[in-house]
Amino acid sequence: MAMAMALRRLSSSIDKPIRPLIRSTSCYMSSLPSEAVDEKERSRVTWPKQLNAPLEEVDPEIADIIEHEKARQWKGLELIPSENFTSVSVMQAVGSVMTNKYSEGYPGARYYGGNEYIDMAETLCQKRALEAFRLDPEKWGVNVQPLSGSPANFHVYTALLKPHERIMALDLPHGGHLSHGYQTDTKKISAVSIFFETMPYRLDESTGYIDYDQMEKSATLFRPKLIVAGASAYARLYDYARIRKVCNKQKAVMLADMAHISGLVAANVIPSPFDYADVVTTTTHKSLRGPRGAMIFFRKGVKEINKQGKEVLYDFEDKINQAVFPGLQGGPHNHTITGLAVALKQATTSEYKAYQEQVLSNSAKFAQTLMERGYELVSGGTDNHLVLVNLKPKGIDGSRVEKVLEAVHIASNKNTVPGDVSAMVPGGIRMGTPALTSRGFVEEDFAKVAEYFDKAVTIALKVKSEAQGTKLKDFVSAMESSSTIQSEIAKLRHEVEEFAKQFPTIGFEKETMKYKN
């Protein structure tokens, strides 16, 4: 009954105009001006005034840190492929009164009162999630409450596996993710590998592509209950049909973790895992460009007709929902769910599709320019939003290059490449195009970014040659103590900043910034 009432309220409210939450571009969600408050409504206590005061008045230290971060985002080049710039409208929703409400449970079945509008927001978010990925609500459901991607994956394992049942996933040094159960020969790094037995599949190091033949052989021996199709540093498309075949052979669940590529999938510019997977997880803040959260999609309805002619139904929905709450979470973050609903609406627009097409074009141009400048890319190129540069042929590693890039205001991240033995001093750099594409970068701009990257690597090689030891701290010391090196860094940093400042800011206006120089 409560669910029906919530749905009726939702359907009756969709066509009603919504009054704007704020009157300016500021993202501070303060109350109405004090002069608009009737004298009779004034409290006889003092704290409501502080609660309604703006951030710069209540906490100037934090306000100042935020202003510095704005300047960093404006003057720098954001190349971390798991980052993006979300919209003002999403930030307004995330910074709204929806953060105040507790709502353990699900729409229509809460353990707290007063959730009429929380139910409406979550139900609308679920509806938009299915629409964004073109899913039939009779065949797919979605949970929008997971707090982030790693917890979302653990929710799925907990829901569908017994303790110490077996998981196969792409090896972390070959582009996988910690949450897929990474462990070394001597240590269980991810908690997933503590509670479940895990075995990696890997790339064919001669090509940089996933070795599906070896995966199938390993699965035959290991007999996993669940196989993960997903990565954090793999620049090629997954062969979902091939993994589905392996899963069918082993009677294993196929989990697609599309955290990095969900925006591309939503825009229908790369193949969708939904055609093959049983369960799909994703974060919401990477290429999808929403707030920091996660979703779990699951098949429902008729799975097959058994030998007796009876329908066999998927049993994922109740198991996954119960694993999220009450299994591993309490109250959901309603402000995040509300912001996600906004992002999912944006993901169905023509502007969004054009953006994701540009993400791919920029990535291809970036890869081409890097290779023309003599850099080796793992797999020899890219089919998605990222490139993984193998720096070992250049005689340098990702940790050292990352330090120089950061000094010149280029944000990237060191990353393992096949053959690495240390995650702290890996041989690669991972870079992506979603964030800068959100700022309006096109192909020719990424050719320029590749030039800046090349200059930074050249500086890193000079620093390495001058360092008095082989440790990273020796490299940093040499970089900071050499006046010649510092001069080169300052020159490149100025070039980067002047270039970056030509492009629009996202989430705030340049004119409102405190630090504009």
UniProtKB/Swiss-Prot annotation:
GO MF annotation terms: glycine hydroxymethyltransferase activity; mRNA binding; poly(U) RNA binding; pyridoxal phosphate binding
Induction comment from the UniProt entry of this chain: Circadian-regulation. Induction by light.
Disruption outcome: Displays a lethal photorespiratory phenotype when grown at ambient carbon dioxide.
Gene Ontology cellular component terms for the protein in this record: apoplast; chloroplast stroma; chloroplast thylakoid; cytosol; cytosolic ribosome; mitochondrial matrix; mitochondrion; nucleus
Modified residues (N6-(pyridoxal phosphate)lysine): K286
Disulfide bond residue pairs: none
Compartments where found: Mitochondrion; Cytoplasm
UniProt pathway annotation: One-carbon metabolism; tetrahydrofolate interconversion
Catalytic activity: (6R)-5,10-methylene-5,6,7,8-tetrahydrofolate + glycine + H2O = (6S)-5,6,7,8-tetrahydrofolate + L-serine
Keyword Transferase in record: yes
A matching Pfam family: SHMT
EC number from the UniProt entry: 2.1.2.1
InterPro entries per record: PyrdxlP-dep_Trfase, PyrdxlP-dep_Trfase_major, PyrdxlP-dep_Trfase_small, Ser_HO-MeTrfase, Ser_HO-MeTrfase-like, Ser_HO-MeTrfase_PLP_BS, SHMT-like_dom
Function: Functions in the photorespiratory pathway in catalyzing the interconversion of serine and glycine. Involved in controlling cell damage caused by abiotic stress, such as high light and salt and the hypersensitive defense response of plants.
Family indicated by similarity: Belongs to the SHMT family.
Extra facts: Recessive mutant shmt1-1 (shm1-3) shows enhanced susceptibility to salt stress and to biotrophic and necrotrophic pathogens.
Subunit structure, as described in the record: Homotetramer. Interacts with GLU1. Interacts with UBP16.
The name this protein goes by in its record: Serine hydroxymethyltransferase 1, mitochondrial
Organism: Arabidopsis thaliana (Mouse-ear cress)
Taxonomic classification: Eukaryota, Viridiplantae, Streptophyta, Embryophyta, Tracheophyta
Gene: SHM1
